Amino acid sequence: MAEVRPVLAAASLARPKGERAAARREHWQKVAIAACEQCGRNRIPQVHALVPVEQYVLKENSSQKILLSPRAELRFSEACRTLGESLTLAAGPEAGFSAAEEAALLDCGFVPASLGPRVLRTETAALAALAALNALRGDF
């Protein structure tokens, strides 16, 4: 993982602004640094500032994108079969992205994929997807 780009969605519970948003970003950057130190990783992911989904899709230009969606027919493992070196992964808030936000992500080129029959918490879904991706790429 090279970057973390938090997005503000309609269903997002946390809505920090101003100094509070900057403090949260700094906190998560420190968490990323500590995690890298613990596991011996020499490249620290950059944690970006919080932006609305609508603003995020205007700047997203990755060639391969997966949107985690419990309603998707395509399984995550199938979506990852043709991956190159980089991938952008989108995990929504606890209640999911709104229909408009999901449409914007799909229009931006995200492919919806499911992690299976269980609906996972947002933080669990993102970690499960990253772990599955590492396993599929032979990192385990």
Predicted regions located by residue number:
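A short acidic, often aromatic-flanked loop/helix-cap motif at beta-alpha or helix-coil junctions
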Residues: 51-57, 73-75, 120
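Acidic-residue sensor for enzyme active/binding pockets
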Residues: 3, 37, 94, 101-102, ...
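Short, glycine/serine-rich, charged loops/turns that create anion-binding
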Residues: 11-13, 72, 94, 134
